[in-house]
Structures are given as structure tokens and as C-alpha cells.
Regions:
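C-terminal transmembrane helical hairpin of 12-TM major facilitator-type secondary transporters
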Residues: 276-338
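Conserved MFS/SLC helix-loop-helix module at the cytosolic interface between two early adjacent transmembrane helices
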Residues: 63-102
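Juxtamembrane intracellular "pre-TM" segments in multi-pass secondary transporters
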Residues: 1-9, 187-216
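Helix-loop-helix hairpin linking two adjacent transmembrane segments in secondary transporters
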Residues: 140-187
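Cytoplasmic helix-loop-helix junction between adjacent transmembrane helices
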Residues: 107-144
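Extracytoplasmic gate region of multi-pass secondary transporters
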Residues: 32-33, 210-261
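Glycine-rich segments within core transmembrane alpha-helices of 12-TM secondary carriers
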Residues: 135-153, 358-368
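Symmetry-related core transmembrane helices of the 12-TM Major Facilitator Superfamily/SLC fold
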Residues: 166-183, 384-402
Length: 421
């Protein structure tokens, strides 16, 4: 009994320290969402160049997720998580001294390692909890996505007070302090590691399972779309509605905050109602929101008996923000429900599978800001970003419709993965 209480206490401590650390990592990872705006002005970048700048941390953070997930299975989450955080401190600090576009791109790639912490923390946290509580635990950890909102609350104030160069220095100190706190308040359980008799190649055999690629596509929508919009919305408010940086970041946080914090709710709902049903409804909510958000401001000329009447159709900033809030809430729940699939169907390879799925979501978050900028340069229509997202949701709905049996409640067949010896 005493041993069970100690295990529960350690599990709660691991969950708390990991969630806090992931929140800080995500805040650093999303730094260019705000920092990129004064840098864009300073360097005279076009929209596509800004999109590439904002997306560079997402690229590296995505690419490292697979090896980090595998290393977590092999060596344990505590040492890998700590190592990732420590390795980003110097690159983040050096951003404050960058003066050329290529320097920002290179340092952005290096700071992007912070985004790989998700592939470490997910299996690390999940293995401390039984399956019936795993969805909620992973949802609580995933609420660290709210670090994006933290950046939007804190970064404009720091830039206004001390200039943009101060922001990366403050974030570097915060990352160092967080890494040390995590090491002090986390634990290692060797029983959670995949035995050395299981090779990396054996762990990667899950890639032959079609379900993995299905979940990659879903996650590229709910997480990739979230990251892409989190990076883009501050600039969108500035350009579309004329808000200053502080007000634009605050309004953008109305999307980022629920999109992160409510992930825990998604884990709880998925535990109760099943991953399929929750993900299905999430996609439909996103479909409706993106359809409405994609409609550009339009002036219609209507011929009436009294002459020509001009009718302006456009979303006010408040209606726009309300729709973003709903979409962010749905995405938060969807991020947890997709990982509920993984926890249920791949219990022996959570690290490898979550790394692959996280890679797909992260690559979506990398590609989308670049495409947002390219579409804006090509069309001049800011809402083209939502037209693109609307199309990706359509793909998910069609894929879900033809991939699952209608009832969606029957358990999936056993995973074809390498069992730990």
C-alpha cells in the first residue's frame, strides 16, 4: 500500500514537472510568432520570408521528434527531456545578437529543438499511469501547448519595455531555470524503458501499420493547424484589422490559450467517449469554423427597385476571434483524442509512434506558415490561410469516413508492433 502511494505521488510529480517544463519549451518554440514581427520590419521581409522565419523552429522541432521518442523508450524520459532543454539555452540567447536573415534562420533551427520535448514527455508521462487514466494524463501534459499563449501575453510587454533583443535573453534564462527545476522534481523508473534487446529497427516497424499514417494526417490538422495559426494570427490581426502588436497578440491568445489548456479536457472526454467519436466531431467543428473564416471581406452590388445597393460582407474582429476560440477549443480536444488512439493501440511503442505522429503534426506546422505567406503574396487575400485549412479538414473527414467502421466503437485490431522482450 505504501509503495502504491509512493508511485502515485511520483506519477503526479512527474506529470506536474513535465507539464510545466513543456509549457516553457512551447513558449520558447513559438517565440517568432511575436519576435518575427519587429524582425520582419527591421529586415524588410516579404510575407513568404516571414512565414519561413516563423516556421524554422517548427521544422527542426518536428524532425527530432522521432529520434527523441525512440531515445525516450530506450533511455527514459527524464535524461532526454533535461538534455533537450539544456541544449537550447545558448541558441536562444544568441538570437538577441543576430543581425542578418540567415542568422535568424540558423538559430531558429537550433531553438526548434525545444519543440521536440513533446515526443519525450508524452511517453514519459503516459507510462506512469494506468491505461484508464492515460488519456487524461497525456491531455494534461499536452496542455503545455498553452505556452504559445504565454508568449503572446509576455513577449509584447518585454519588447515594449526593453526592445526585441531582450526577449530571447529572458527566454534563455527561463529555459535554463526550468531545466534545473525539472531535474530536481522528476523521477526515473527503469521498468518504463524498452529493453536493450529491442532494436531501433524493431521499434520502427510500427511505420508499416496503416493506422500510424492515418493518425499522422489527423494530427497534422489539429496540431499542425494549431501551430501554423498560432504563428500567424498575431500578424493577421495587425495586417487585417490594424491592431498594434500588444492588442494583436492578446487577441491571438484567444485562440492559443484554449488550444493548449483545454487539451486536458480532450483527454478526459476521449477516455469517456472514445477517440473515434471525439475526433470525428472535432473535425466537423473545425470544418464549419474554417468555412466561415475563409470567406474574404466582400462588397456586393445588388440591384433593387430603388437603385444599386452596396452590401458589405466581412467578419468583425470580435466575430473572427469568437470563431477562432471555437476552432482552438476543438483543436485542443482533437490533439488529445488522436493521442488517445496511440495510447490505446500502441502501448508498447508509445515513444516511437508518438514521435512519428508528432513529426507529421510538426511538419504541418512548418509548411503552413510558409504556404500562408505564399498564398498572401500570390492572391493578396489574407483569409486564403483558412481556405487552405478548410481543404485539409475535408481530407480528414473523408479519410475517417472510409477508414473506420460506422459504429466506430469497436476496438481496433491488435497493433502489429514489436513487443518488448
Amino acid at each position: 500500500m505504501k509503495s502504491d502511494r509512493q508511485t502515485d505521488r511520483r506519477a503526479l510529480t512527474v506529470l506536474t514537472s513535465s507539464t510545466f517544463s513543456f509549457t516553457v519549451c512551447f513558449a520558447v518554440w513559438m517565440m517568432f510568432a511575436v519576435l518575427g514581427i519587429p524582425v520582419k520590419k527591421m529586415l524588410g521581409l516579404n510575407e513568404t520570408q516571414f512565414g519561413l522565419l516563423a516556421a524554422m523552429p517548427v521544422l527542426s522541432g518536428s524532425l527530432v521528434r522521432v529520434p527523441l521518442g525512440i531515445w525516450t523508450d530506450r533511455f527514459g524520459g527524464r535524461i532526454v527531456f533535461f538534455g533537450v532543454m539544456i541544449s537550447t539555452v545558448i541558441p536562444v540567447w544568441l538570437i538577441g545578437y543576430a543581425t542578418a536573415y540567415w542568422q535568424f534562420l540558423v538559430l531558429g533551427l537550433l531553438l526548434g529543438l525545444a519543440g521536440g520535448c513533446f515526443a519525450v514527455g508524452t511517453p514519459y508521462v503516459a507510462r506512469w499511469f494506468p491505461q484508464e487514466r492515460r488519456g487524461l494524463a497525456m491531455g494534461i501534459f499536452g496542455a503545455g501547448n498553452s505556452g504559445s499563449a504565454v508568449t503572446k501575453f509576455v513577449a509584447p510587454a518585454i519588447i515594449a519595455a526593453w526592445g526585441w533583443q531582450a526577449l530571447p535573453r529572458v527566454f534563455a534564462v527561463a529555459m535554463l531555470a526550468t531545466a534545473l527545476l525539472f531535474w530536481c522534481f522528476s523521477y526515473t523508473n527503469p521498468a518504463h524503458n524498452v529493453p536493450n534487446t529491442t532494436s531501433f529497427a524493431a521499434q520502427l516497424r510500427v511505420l508499416k501499420d496503416r493506422r500510424v499514417w492515418r493518425y499522422c494526417q489527423y494530427y497534422s490538422v489539429v496540431f499542425g493547424g494549431y501551430v501554423g495559426l498560432a504563428l500567424w494570427m498575431t500578424k493577421y490581426y495587425v495586417g487585417q484589422y490594424g491592431f498594434d502588436l500588444g492588442a494583436a497578440a492578446l487577441l491571438a491568445a484567444c485562440f492559443s490559450l484554449p488550444g493548449g489548456v483545454l487539451r486536458a479536457l480532450g483527454g478526459w472526454v476521449s477516455d469517456r467517449h472514445g477517440a473515434y467519436k471525439v475526433t470525428w466531431w472535432v473535425m466537423w467543428v473545425c470544418w464549419v469554423c474554417f468555412f466561415l473564416l475563409s470567406y474574404p471581406p466582400t462588397t456586393m452590388q445588388v440591384q433593387t427597385v430603388d437603385g444599386t445597393v452596396a452590401i458589405d460582407l466581412a467578419l468583425s474582429p470580435w466575430v473572427f476571434t469568437a470563431l477562432l476560440f471555437v476552432a482552438g477549443t476543438a483543436m485542443a480536444i482533437g490533439k488529445a483524442s488522436v493521442f488517445k488512439f496511440i495510447g490505446d493501440e500502441f502501448p508498447d511503442n508509445i515513444g516511437a509512434v508518438s514521435g512519428v505522429v508528432g513529426l507529421a503534426g510538426g511538419l504541418g506546422g512548418f509548411v503552413l506558415p510558409i504556404l500562408f505567406g505564399a498564398l498572401l503574396d500570390l492572391t493578396g487575400v489574407r483569409s486564403s490561410a483558412f481556405m487552405l485549412l478548410y481543404g485539409t479538414v475535408c481530407v480528414s473527414l473523408v479519410w475517417m469516413h472510409y477508414s473506420f467502421r460506422p459504429q466506430g466503437a469497436a476496438p481496433a485490431p491488435a497493433a502489429t508492433v514489436a513487443k518488448a522482450a
